Amino acid sequence: MLAVALLCTAPLASAQQNAVALNPAIDMPGYLRVAAEAAKYRETRRLSEDEFIRMSREPGTVILDARSREKFDELHIKGALNLSFPDIAVDSLKNALPDKSTRTLIYCNNNFLGAEKPFPSKMASASLNISTYIALYNYGYRNVYELGPLVDIKASKLDFESATEAKPNPPRPQLFLF
Protein backbone atom coordinates (compact mmCIF):
# COMPACT_ATOMS: atom_id res chain seq x y z
CA MET A 1 0.00 0.00 0.00
CA LEU A 2 2.81 2.41 0.88
CA ALA A 3 4.50 1.64 -2.44
CA VAL A 4 1.30 2.57 -4.32
CA ALA A 5 1.02 5.85 -2.41
CA LEU A 6 4.64 6.71 -3.16
CA LEU A 7 4.18 5.91 -6.84
CA CYS A 8 1.07 8.10 -7.00
CA THR A 9 2.67 11.12 -5.33
CA ALA A 10 6.08 10.86 -7.01
CA PRO A 11 4.94 12.43 -10.32
CA LEU A 12 3.33 15.34 -8.44
CA ALA A 13 6.44 16.03 -6.37
CA SER A 14 8.59 15.72 -9.47
CA ALA A 15 6.36 18.16 -11.41
CA GLN A 16 6.54 20.69 -8.55
CA GLN A 17 10.33 20.41 -8.38
CA ASN A 18 10.56 20.84 -12.16
CA ALA A 19 8.33 23.92 -12.07
CA VAL A 20 10.54 25.57 -9.45
CA ALA A 21 13.68 24.49 -11.31
CA LEU A 22 12.40 26.09 -14.53
CA ASN A 23 11.99 29.44 -12.78
CA PRO A 24 12.97 29.70 -9.11
CA ALA A 25 11.29 33.14 -8.97
CA ILE A 26 7.86 31.50 -9.42
CA ASP A 27 6.76 29.03 -6.74
CA MET A 28 3.19 27.80 -7.12
CA PRO A 29 3.47 25.10 -4.41
CA GLY A 30 4.85 27.74 -2.01
CA TYR A 31 2.05 30.14 -2.93
CA LEU A 32 -0.59 27.48 -2.29
CA ARG A 33 0.95 26.68 1.11
CA VAL A 34 0.93 30.37 2.11
CA ALA A 35 -2.60 30.83 0.73
CA ALA A 36 -3.91 27.95 2.85
CA GLU A 37 -2.22 29.37 5.96
CA ALA A 38 -3.49 32.89 5.21
CA ALA A 39 -7.03 31.60 4.66
CA LYS A 40 -7.14 30.19 8.19
CA TYR A 41 -5.74 33.42 9.64
CA ARG A 42 -8.20 35.55 7.59
CA GLU A 43 -11.30 33.77 8.96
CA THR A 44 -11.33 35.94 12.10
CA ARG A 45 -10.31 39.17 10.37
CA ARG A 46 -13.34 40.00 8.25
CA LEU A 47 -15.13 43.10 9.53
CA SER A 48 -18.65 44.46 9.37
CA GLU A 49 -19.04 47.94 7.92
CA ASP A 50 -19.40 49.41 11.44
CA GLU A 51 -16.28 47.59 12.70
CA PHE A 52 -14.33 48.75 9.63
CA ILE A 53 -15.36 52.38 10.26
CA ARG A 54 -14.55 52.17 13.98
CA MET A 55 -11.12 50.65 13.39
CA SER A 56 -10.33 53.09 10.56
CA ARG A 57 -10.71 56.00 12.99
CA GLU A 58 -8.21 54.60 15.48
CA PRO A 59 -4.70 56.12 15.43
CA GLY A 60 -2.08 54.25 13.45
CA THR A 61 -4.58 52.47 11.19
CA VAL A 62 -4.10 52.51 7.41
CA ILE A 63 -6.80 51.81 4.83
CA LEU A 64 -5.19 50.18 1.79
CA ASP A 65 -6.84 50.14 -1.63
CA ALA A 66 -5.06 47.77 -4.05
CA ARG A 67 -7.12 48.66 -7.13
CA SER A 68 -5.54 50.42 -10.10
CA ARG A 69 -4.69 54.11 -9.72
CA GLU A 70 -7.35 54.90 -12.34
CA LYS A 71 -10.15 53.19 -10.39
CA PHE A 72 -8.85 54.59 -7.09
CA ASP A 73 -8.93 58.13 -8.50
CA GLU A 74 -12.53 57.64 -9.64
CA LEU A 75 -13.76 56.73 -6.15
CA HIS A 76 -12.28 55.35 -2.94
CA ILE A 77 -12.86 55.30 0.80
CA LYS A 78 -11.82 58.67 2.16
CA GLY A 79 -8.28 58.62 3.51
CA ALA A 80 -7.31 55.36 1.78
CA LEU A 81 -3.79 54.79 0.53
CA ASN A 82 -3.46 53.38 -2.99
CA LEU A 83 -0.94 50.65 -3.72
CA SER A 84 -2.04 48.89 -6.88
CA PHE A 85 -1.86 45.11 -6.54
CA PRO A 86 0.67 44.60 -9.37
CA ASP A 87 2.97 47.04 -7.55
CA ILE A 88 2.95 45.16 -4.24
CA ALA A 89 6.59 44.20 -3.67
CA VAL A 90 9.22 44.49 -0.93
CA ASP A 91 10.23 48.09 -1.74
CA SER A 92 6.73 49.47 -2.34
CA LEU A 93 5.51 47.91 0.90
CA LYS A 94 8.48 49.39 2.80
CA ASN A 95 7.43 52.82 1.50
CA ALA A 96 3.69 52.44 2.02
CA LEU A 97 3.66 50.33 5.20
CA PRO A 98 7.15 50.44 6.73
CA ASP A 99 5.98 48.84 10.00
CA LYS A 100 4.61 45.35 9.40
CA SER A 101 2.62 45.58 12.64
CA THR A 102 0.58 48.56 11.38
CA ARG A 103 -3.12 47.77 11.45
CA THR A 104 -4.13 47.65 7.79
CA LEU A 105 -7.72 47.58 6.54
CA ILE A 106 -8.39 46.41 3.00
CA TYR A 107 -11.39 46.45 0.67
CA CYS A 108 -11.96 45.77 -3.03
CA ASN A 109 -14.32 45.96 -5.99
CA ASN A 110 -16.45 43.12 -4.70
CA ASN A 111 -17.37 44.99 -1.51
CA PHE A 112 -19.58 47.54 -3.27
CA LEU A 113 -22.82 47.65 -5.27
CA GLY A 114 -24.09 50.65 -7.17
CA ALA A 115 -20.81 52.05 -8.51
CA GLU A 116 -19.79 49.61 -11.21
CA LYS A 117 -17.40 51.98 -13.02
CA PRO A 118 -14.99 52.56 -10.12
CA PHE A 119 -15.78 49.19 -8.49
CA PRO A 120 -16.25 46.67 -11.33
CA SER A 121 -17.14 43.23 -9.97
CA LYS A 122 -14.75 40.32 -10.36
CA MET A 123 -15.49 36.63 -10.09
CA ALA A 124 -15.84 35.84 -6.39
CA SER A 125 -12.87 33.47 -6.51
CA ALA A 126 -10.76 36.21 -8.14
CA SER A 127 -11.70 38.92 -5.64
CA LEU A 128 -8.91 41.43 -5.11
CA ASN A 129 -9.39 41.16 -1.32
CA ILE A 130 -8.25 37.54 -1.47
CA SER A 131 -5.15 38.26 -3.56
CA THR A 132 -4.24 41.32 -1.50
CA TYR A 133 -4.69 39.52 1.81
CA ILE A 134 -2.53 36.60 0.70
CA ALA A 135 0.16 38.92 -0.70
CA LEU A 136 0.34 40.99 2.49
CA TYR A 137 0.42 37.82 4.58
CA ASN A 138 3.19 36.42 2.37
CA TYR A 139 5.27 39.57 2.95
CA GLY A 140 4.87 39.23 6.73
CA TYR A 141 1.95 41.59 7.41
CA ARG A 142 -0.30 39.94 10.01
CA ASN A 143 -2.31 42.90 11.34
CA VAL A 144 -4.57 42.98 8.27
CA TYR A 145 -8.37 43.16 8.37
CA GLU A 146 -10.82 43.04 5.51
CA LEU A 147 -14.18 44.69 4.89
CA GLY A 148 -16.45 41.65 4.74
CA PRO A 149 -19.93 42.54 3.48
CA LEU A 150 -21.27 43.55 0.10
CA VAL A 151 -22.31 47.16 0.70
CA ASP A 152 -24.71 49.26 -1.36
CA ILE A 153 -22.65 52.39 -1.93
CA LYS A 154 -25.77 54.58 -1.82
CA ALA A 155 -26.68 53.27 1.66
CA SER A 156 -23.14 52.94 2.99
CA LYS A 157 -21.98 54.68 6.16
CA LEU A 158 -18.44 54.88 4.73
CA ASP A 159 -17.16 58.21 3.43
CA PHE A 160 -16.02 58.14 -0.20
CA GLU A 161 -14.08 60.62 -2.27
CA SER A 162 -12.63 60.87 -5.74
CA ALA A 163 -9.34 62.40 -6.79
CA THR A 164 -11.20 65.38 -8.25
CA GLU A 165 -13.01 65.96 -4.95
CA ALA A 166 -9.83 65.50 -2.93
CA LYS A 167 -7.93 68.14 -4.90
CA PRO A 168 -9.17 71.54 -6.02
CA ASN A 169 -9.64 72.00 -9.74
CA PRO A 170 -6.82 73.91 -11.41
CA PRO A 171 -7.75 77.46 -12.43
CA ARG A 172 -9.06 77.79 -15.95
CA PRO A 173 -7.04 79.95 -18.31
CA GLN A 174 -8.70 83.24 -19.06
CA LEU A 175 -9.56 84.01 -22.64
CA PHE A 176 -9.12 87.53 -23.85
CA LEU A 177 -11.01 88.56 -26.96
CA PHE A 178 -9.79 91.65 -28.76
Task: Locate predicted features.
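Cleavable N-terminal signal peptides
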Residues: 2-3, 13
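Rhodanese-like catalytic fold shared by cysteine-dependent sulfurtransferases
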Residues: 14-43, 73-77, 81-83, 88-178
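A short, well-structured juxtamembrane/interface segment
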Residues: 41-55
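Short Gly/charged-rich anion-binding patches and loops
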Residues: 51, 67, 131
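Short, solvent-exposed loop/turn elements at domain surfaces
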Residues: 54, 71-74
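Short coil/turn segments at beta-strand junctions that form active-site/ligand-binding loops
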Residues: 59-64, 100-103
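Short hydrophobic beta-strand that contains or immediately precedes a catalytic carboxylate
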Residues: 62-67, 80-83
